[in-house]
């Protein structure tokens, strides 16, 4: 009999809802993947040891996905990195180090124990209840009923990652796959459907992470200002008619002359914000190549509030990825071969990773909205020297980064090429 297979599964759903704003207690600002300053007497939360690395991992992964996929991109760096870190708990020393170093951690500067405590702190902070936004992150382990897991592993994943363990009958792969999909669908309130594809009867474990985010704009768009049909230019030869939201509101934004792109920060109620990056026509690859932590820090320092004439499409996109083909290209090579040692899970050797699947969705639409029709042209970069209000017209492909502000964690990262692709 061949080796048994292990699946890593990550899912994410982001939904933005428009509603009346509450009184603000001050503007939120993107600081980039750097923790905010603390008083000298106050120790920094443990998650500050890991969030910059997660951001760097996200940017590396994005570039590989962009090189492979010309269309929409959307994934959750927090979901994928959490799943891999959780897996490392069941790996022996060499394999565990390979996983964490592949994520980008320097184990000399940040020992493994500190990394896991960082994830524990991050997940705990993200799970804190908030009346202003809904954020749910969870981890689950589905282990073949014929195997007995090591109690130390079960205790560790529960204590550090809040992971629940379930017994599963992988000899009946169809039924078990349906049960796991149903579980993930319930945890994401019906938004993530059929995330787990078919798998082999030799599967012995599925490690799943899910993240659900739902928030309301600090400054809502009026549905009466939404144009039912406006042109969105996928490329030089292709245009689509899409619903285009419109508002004149105070937002932080800038025009980066070096990279030829507009950068816009839109705040949600609660501790979250969206960063939208709109390259000038023909400049997407230039901007993507420059995606580095220092670029995000620069933007965070230069964003200034201004009354902005904003046009933003309603969109709903998703991303489904088999990351076993992508992860080796960014340093996670050896965890996918027969030499990887995950005997810390059950005490048995010859258990290898077969699949690393990830699915994420984003919905920035207004339910049931009906509005008039209009069309637009390719926009030019906003100019601060004109008498009219600066404007940002998102009628061509743009980047989307969604941040949780307290932890400075990059929850979602993507590119909108076709707003109506689903």
From Swiss-Prot:
CDD domains linked: serpinA11 (cd19557)
Coiled-coil annotated residue ranges, if any: none
Residues modified by glycosylation: 94, 106, 169, 350
Signal peptide start-end: 1-19
Molecular function GO labels: serine-type endopeptidase inhibitor activity
GO CC annotation: extracellular space
Annotated keywords: Glycoprotein, Protease inhibitor, Secreted, Serine protease inhibitor, Signal
Subcellular compartments: Secreted
Highest rank taxon of the organism: Eukaryota
Stated family: Belongs to the serpin family.
Protein name as catalogued: Serpin A11
Taxonomic source organism: Homo sapiens
Primary gene name: SERPINA11
């Amino acid at each position: 009999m061949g080796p048994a297979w292990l699946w890593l599964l990550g899912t994410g759903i982001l939904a933005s809802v428009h509603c009346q704003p509450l009184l603000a207690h001050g503007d939120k600002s993107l600081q980039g993947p750097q923790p905010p300053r603390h008083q000298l007497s106050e120790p920094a939360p443990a998650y500050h040891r890991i969030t910059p690395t997660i951001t760097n991992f996200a940017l590396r992964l994005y570039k590989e996905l962009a090189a492979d996929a010309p269309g929409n991109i959307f994934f959750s760096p927090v979901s994928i990195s959490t799943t891999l870190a959780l897996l490392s708990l069941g790996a022996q020393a060499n394999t565990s180090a390979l996983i964490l170093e592949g994520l980008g951690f320097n184990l000399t500067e940040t020992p493994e124990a500190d990394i896991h405590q960082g994830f524990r702190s991050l997940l705990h902070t993200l799970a804190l209840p908030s009346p202003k936004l809904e954020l749910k992150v969870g981890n689950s382990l589905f282990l073949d009923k014929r195997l007995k897991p090591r109690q130390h592993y079960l205790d560790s994943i529960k204590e550090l990652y809040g992971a629940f363990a379930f017994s599963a009958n992988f000899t009946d792969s169809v039924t078990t796959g349906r049960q796991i999909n149903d579980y993930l669908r319930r945890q994401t309130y019906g938004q993530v459907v059929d995330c787990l594809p078919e798998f082999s009867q030799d599967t012995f474990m599925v490690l799943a992470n899910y993240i659900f985010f739902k928030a309301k704009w600090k400054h809502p768009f009026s549905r009466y200002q939404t144009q039912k049909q406006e042109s969105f230019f996928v490329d030089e030869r292709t245009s689509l008619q899409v619903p285009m939201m419109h508002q004149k509101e105070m937002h932080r934004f800038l025009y980066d002359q070096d990279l030829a792109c507009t950068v816009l920060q839109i705040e949600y109620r609660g501790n979250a914000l969206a960063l939208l990056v709109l390259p000038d026509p023909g400049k997407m690859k230039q901007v993507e190549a420059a995606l580095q932590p220092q670029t995000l820090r620069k933007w965070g320092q230069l964003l200034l509030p201004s009354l902005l004439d904003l046009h933003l499409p309603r969109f709903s996109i998703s991303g489904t990825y088999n990351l076993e083909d992508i992860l080796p290209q960014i340093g996670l090579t050896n965890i996918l071969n027969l030499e990887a040692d995950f005997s810390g899970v059950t005490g048995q050797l010859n258990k290898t990773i077969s699949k690393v699947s990830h699915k994420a969705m984003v919905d920035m639409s207004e339910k049931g909205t009906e509005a008039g029709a209009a069309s637009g042209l390719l926009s030019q970069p906003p100019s601060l020297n004109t008498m009219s209000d600066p404007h940002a017209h998102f009628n061509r492909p743009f980047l989307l980064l969604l941040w949780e502000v307290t932890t400075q964690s990059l929850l979602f990262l993507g590119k909108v090429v076709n707003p109506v692709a689903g």
